[in-house]
Amino acid sequence: MAEPDPSHPLETQAGKVQEAQDSDSDSEGGAAGGEADMDFLRNLFSQTLSLGSQKERLLDELTLEGVARYMQSERCRRVICLVGAGISTSAGIPDFRSPSTGLYDNLEKYHLPYPEAIFEISYFKKHPEPFFALAKELYPGQFKPTICHYFMRLLKDKGLLLRCYTQNIDTLERIAGLEQEDLVEAHGTFYTSHCVSASCRHEYPLSWMKEKIFSEVTPKCEDCQSLVKPDIVFFGESLPARFFSCMQSDFLKVDLLLVMGTSLQVQPFASLISKAPLSTPRLLINKEKAGQSDPFLGMILGLGGGMDFDSKKAYRDVAWLGDCDQGCLALAELLGWKKELEDLVRREHASIDAQSGAEAPNPSTSASPRKSPPPAQDEARTTEREKPQ
């Protein structure tokens, strides 16, 4: 092994770190020594990796107006959207943890050992009934995509949408007009279902699953009689392979990261914000700030790239705080798209209403399964769900 070069600044500094550690181990002031070591390490990384250097701003101002002007420039050609439950709540779809209205606060009647059990694959295989009872309660029918969903549709229509990464399993992105190629459904989807038997894996469409749910029949495979499960990611299951394959290529070429309606607390989805190059602006539209982290600790722990909205070194991150639909309307207005967006929402909602009216069940038979819409309009719903790391 080559000997360390004492003239190299990093190796010299590293030697000092070792000396400090050796000295500290022999001292009684461990707490004070640990504090000094942390300060020394901060200085080390700042000097060798330019952690503390001021970066040139990527936007002419760190505001929504600055983002809009950037989007209108030649520099912004590929937008990635990262979305969570907050973009679907205005459609009447609850998130999981909001007090009194979140799904976890309304599961007592299912007599679960703990709320999360309803989404655990091991519990589901033994006791599928609570999940399908909940699925019937939550099944949309009347739910429509929101302004946020249609804003992403506009990005697609204008050739700006590179990909939408969604934590939601409600299929509203598809109903709004995004196609399979546009989407990475990180936590799966109700759009398709599969037999849980590894030797079978027969696939079933949403219309088939919808009929079973509304007839209160536990879905069983027509080939082998095993359970059939919607393709949502339960606790204990891996994320779809597409999540990782798209991530590897998409974030090499993204020009703007648009984050909407997510707390950025669920891994590995939350780590996607750190995949964007340092030269890529990031806009958060959410009710509260999210995704912030200590840049030093983030680098040490491999969680670098946290949002920085407020420090003197902020250079690319913008937070618009409030209702997600209102945030999209505000951005659309700055882009000159507001009327186009509002017209799109009205037109699409009218189409959904017309179809729902044509398919409305007879009141005397309302308990019967409803006729399934064609695939382009298929709907299902739960919402963003916390996944274990």
From Swiss-Prot:
UniProt GO MF annotations: chromatin binding; histone deacetylase activity; histone H4K16 deacetylase activity, NAD-dependent; metal ion binding; NAD+ binding; NAD-dependent protein demyristoylase activity; NAD-dependent protein depalmitoylase activity; NAD-dependent protein lysine deacetylase activity
Catalytic reaction(s) noted: N(6)-acetyl-L-lysyl-[protein] + NAD(+) + H2O = 2''-O-acetyl-ADP-D-ribose + nicotinamide + L-lysyl-[protein]; N(6)-tetradecanoyl-L-lysyl-[protein] + NAD(+) + H2O = 2''-O-tetradecanoyl-ADP-D-ribose + nicotinamide + L-lysyl-[protein]; N(6)-hexadecanoyl-L-lysyl-[protein] + NAD(+) + H2O = 2''-O-hexadecanoyl-ADP-D-ribose + nicotinamide + L-lysyl-[protein]
Signal peptide: none
Keyword Cell cycle: yes
Primary localization: nucleus
List of residues that carry N-acetylalanine: A2
Superkingdom classification of source: Eukaryota
Residues of the active site: H187
Enzyme Commission designation: 2.3.1.286, 2.3.1.-
Control of this protein's activity: Inhibited by Sirtinol, A3 and M15 small molecules. Inhibited by nicotinamide.
Post-translational modification: Phosphorylated at phosphoserine and phosphothreonine. Phosphorylated at Ser-368 by a mitotic kinase CDK1/cyclin B at the G2/M transition; phosphorylation regulates the delay in cell-cycle progression. Phosphorylated at Ser-368 by a mitotic kinase G1/S-specific cyclin E/Cdk2 complex; phosphorylation inactivates SIRT2-mediated alpha-tubulin deacetylation and thereby negatively regulates cell adhesion, cell migration and neurite outgrowth during neuronal differentiation.
GO cellular component: centriole; centrosome; chromosome; cytoplasm; cytosol; glial cell projection; growth cone; heterochromatin
Keyword annotations from UniProtKB, A to Z: Acetylation, Cell cycle, Cell division, Cell membrane, Cell projection, Chromosome, Cytoplasm, Cytoskeleton, Membrane, Metal-binding, Microtubule, Mitosis, NAD, Nucleus, Phosphoprotein, Transferase, Ubl conjugation, Zinc
Chain sites annotated for binding Zn(2+): C195, C200, C221, C224
Gene Ontology BP terms: cell division; cellular response to caloric restriction; cellular response to epinephrine stimulus; cellular response to hypoxia; cellular response to oxidative stress; epigenetic regulation of gene expression; lipid catabolic process; myelination in peripheral nervous system
InterPro entries in the record: DHS-like_NAD/FAD-binding_dom, NAD-dep_sirtuin_deacylases, Sirtuin, Sirtuin_cat_small_dom_sf, Sirtuin_class_I, Ssirtuin_cat_dom
List of residues that carry Phosphoserine: S23, S25, S27, S53, S100, S207, S368, S372
Domain Deacetylase sirtuin-type: 57-338
Family, similarity comment: Belongs to the sirtuin family. Class I subfamily.
Name assigned to this protein: NAD-dependent protein deacetylase sirtuin-2
Species of provenance: Macaca fascicularis
UniProt lineage: Eukaryota, Metazoa, Chordata, Craniata, Vertebrata
